[in-house]
Amino acid sequence: MSAARRDGTLPWLRPDTKTQVTIEYKHDNGAVVPLRVDTIVVSAQHAEDITTEQLRKEIKEKIIKKIQPSGLFIIGGPQGDAGLTGRKIIVDTYGGWGAHGGGAFSGKDFSKVDRSAAYVGRWIAKSLVNAGLARRALVQLSYAIGVAEPLSIYVDTYGTSDKTSDQLVEIIRNNFDLRPGVIVRELNLDRPIYLQTAKNGHFGTNQSFTWEQPKTLKF
């Protein structure tokens, strides 16, 4: 959709376009393996001079099949969402599939662990999976105001690791310095990188983000 707007394939498209993909998974000893895409829904912000019928026809032909369930969508962004705070934190991260601490990212600088610790948690989880220590991992970090080190570290691998949670936590402690200032330095969070987080979420879609590049672990 974004490419079609930029290259003129669908010139009436506007930036605030949302997609929802429903996927069927199977459980495989704690890991989840995608089987098929069940439904794809596209809600596209558009110019005023295109009808819903024309919009549906063009997107069906040029993009995908199941689109625009709510009809017209001319006004988008914060103007269309009164009370919008810090962007939508679930769709920005794991879409309800993983856990979220509840703090928004956008609008906060990198010194806030709502943002920096969420990024390093992603980095840790990807590094564990990349190292073959698990096929699936949830990493939970707990911080307190004025305390540099996390109060607790928890890992759930859903039965996909041959190591205990305590053993994995020890590996994490030996490979990652989780003080906020160090997180900022190691992930280059003080650089002008945040423009790209304003679209398509913070996790998974843009592999150039530092937290998407697994660290080589020593264990």
Segment roles from a protein language model:
Residues A134-R136, S142-F219:
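Internal helix-turn-beta structural module
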Residues M1-T9, I59-K66, L128, G132, ...:
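Structural signal for hydrophobic packing residues in well-ordered secondary-structure cores
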Residues M1-G76, G204-S208, E212-T216:
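Glycine-rich, mobile lid/loop segments that gate access to catalytic sites or pores
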Residues G30, T51, I74, H100, ...:
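Intrinsically disordered, low-complexity acidic/polar segments
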Residues I50-V129:
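Glycine-rich anion/phosphate-binding loop at the beta-strand->alpha-helix junction
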Residues P11-P15, V32-L35, A82-T85, A131, ...:
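Solvent-exposed alpha-helices and their adjacent loops that cap or buttress functional pockets
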Residues Q45-K62, G95-D109, D166-D190, T216-F219:
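Hydrophobic transmembrane alpha-helix bundles
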Residues T19-H46, Q79-G98, L141, I153-T160:
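Short beta-strand elements
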